[in-house]
A protein has these predicted regions:
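Conserved catalytic core of sirtuin-type NAD+-dependent deacylases
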Residues: 1-253
Length: 256
């Protein structure tokens, strides 16, 4: 996947960022989101399955859709691209993977430093309706198990983070946080939700301080992640794009 001449240029790099999108995992059998024919959003309206409003309106339907997606992710294995990215660690002192994917395949391939901008489908967190919570009379506190808002008298003093960690995204009724009783949901970024500020700050810092950035399989249509190659380019880094079709940045990048 990585051409020999590019490998040679990368040998002089001290900090490499690899930025990946849905195309990275397509060969592992995970459909992309935006392909007009086979993408996930070609088959279902994201407003029905990937927004806080959808979960508030029909939580079981949204949960079941994510269970179906999680089943495909669990069957998937890292492809040659994931393996090649992990091997970059053998000759580049510092490699930071920044991914828009939620499938955990970079970690499965052996990449050590992975910033997951859009979360991880294999993790769960509490769904907290902050509008409803702050509209009531109760004083909200933070549940130490799920880090969501809770009402003080709902907290279980005997529950621990390990009780949440063993709960999986699987078919059946939606589980609840063992600490505060809130419904659980996939720990992914839905439409209308902001990215984790700390995660985004780490990604920006990596892009702005790297020697080189390789962009693989991203349509570069979703902000703020799409700005990462530009941030690296504007700081003088070598930026390489590996994509089957050109993107909005292709004229400014080394395109493969």
């Amino acid at each position: 996947m990585i051409a020999p001449d590019l490998q040679e240029r990368l040998r002089a790099v001290r900090h490499l960022v690899v930025f990946t999108g849905a195309g990275m995992s397509a060969e592992s059998g995970i459909p992309t989101f935006r392909d007009p024919a086979e993408g996930l959003w070609a088959k279902v309206d994201p407003a029905d399955v990937a927004t806080p409003h959808a979960f508030r309106k029909n939580p079981q339907f949204v949960w079941d859709w994510h269970v179906h997606l999680a089943d495909a992710v669990r069957r998937a294995r890292p492809n040659d691209g994931h393996e090649a990215v992990a091997r970059l660690q053998e000759f580049v002192p510092r490699v930071t993977v920044i991914t828009q994917n939620i499938d955990n395949l970079h970690q499965a391939a052996g990449s050590q430093t992975v910033i997951e901008l859009h979360g991880n489908l294999m993790r769960l967190k509490a769904f907290v309706d902050t509008d409803e919570m702050f509209g009531g009379d109760a004083s909200p506190v933070i549940c130490r198990i799920c880090n969501g808002y809770a009402v003080d008298d709902e907290l279980d003093p005997y529950a621990g983070p390990e009780d949440l960690a063993v709960i999986e995204l699987q078919a059946g009724p939606i589980p609840r946080c063992p600490g505060c009783g809130a419904l659980l949901r996939p720990d992914v970024v839905w439409f209308g939700e902001p990215l984790d500020p700390g995660m985004l700050e780490d990604a920006f810092l990596a892009a702005e301080t790297c020697d080189a950035l390789i962009c693989i399989g991203s349509s570069l249509e979703v902000e703020p992640a799409a700005s990462l190659p530009w941030r690296a380019l504007n700081r003088g880094a070598m930026v390489v794009e590996i994509n089957p079709v050109p993107t909005s940045l292709s004229l400014s990048l080394i395109h493969i």
